[in-house]
């Protein structure tokens, strides 16, 4: 299992950063996501399910993303999602925003990638922690970059 927790401060309002995580804007921060369609409940509800299609090179992967936790208050916003990728990995992601002041937001990105079968566990053991850290850092940079455009 791979786990991570990283945080950064973004020089803009919590509302602007949070808007990037709305369904209509998700492709801005996750450019490899080609489809993100709500199929159950409302996007701001625990238990909401989305059909998501992700492109990795020439390969397309489609899976169901379930919202496990959702909080939207003035000073803190949090969303936790989970999905199984390629029948091999169970991925859980948590995006937390904490209002520091009117123009600064703490962004915390944490998650875990767990092998659900022998192939998944073997691939995680063979994978590089360095490359996973790079993906996490690139995502955080992308969120920061997109937030500054708003």
Residue ranges and their predicted role:
Residues 1-45:
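Hydrophobic ligand-binding cavity/cleft-lining segments
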Residues 2-5, 60-65, 88-94:
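Short, surface-exposed coil-to-beta transition loops
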Residues 16-18, 29, 60-62, 75, ...:
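Short acidic, gly/pro-rich beta-turn/loop elements at beta-sheet edges
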Residues 16-21, 26, 50, 67, ...:
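Hydrophobic pocket/interface hotspot
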Residues 13, 43, 72-73, 100-103:
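Short strand-connecting beta-turns/loops that link adjacent beta-strands
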Residues 82-137:
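Beta-strand/loop substructures that line and gate deep hydrophobic ligand-binding cavities in soluble
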Residues 7-11, 37, 53, 66, ...:
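Generic structural detector for well-ordered beta-strands
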Residues 38-86, 138-150:
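Glycine-rich portal/gate segments that line the openings of hydrophobic small-molecule binding cavities
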């Amino acid at each position: 299992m791979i786990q991570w927790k990283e945080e950064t401060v973004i020089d803009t309002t919590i509302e602007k950063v949070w808007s990037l995580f709305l369904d209509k804007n998700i492709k801005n921060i996750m450019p490899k996501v080609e489809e993100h369609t709500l199929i159950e409940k409302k996007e701001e509800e625990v238990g909401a399910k989305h059909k998501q299609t992700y492109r990795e090179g020439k390969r397309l992967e489609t899976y169901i993303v379930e919202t496990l936790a959702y909080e939207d208050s003035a000073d803190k916003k949090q969303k936790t999602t989970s999905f199984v990728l390629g029948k091999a990995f169970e991925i859980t992601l948590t995006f937390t925003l904490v209002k520091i002041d009117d123009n600064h937001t703490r962004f915390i990105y944490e998650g875990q990638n767990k092998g659900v079968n022998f192939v998944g566990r073997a691939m995680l053991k063979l994978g590089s922690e360095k490359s996973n850290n790079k993906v996490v850092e690139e995502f955080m940079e992308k969120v920061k970059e997109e937030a500054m455009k708003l």
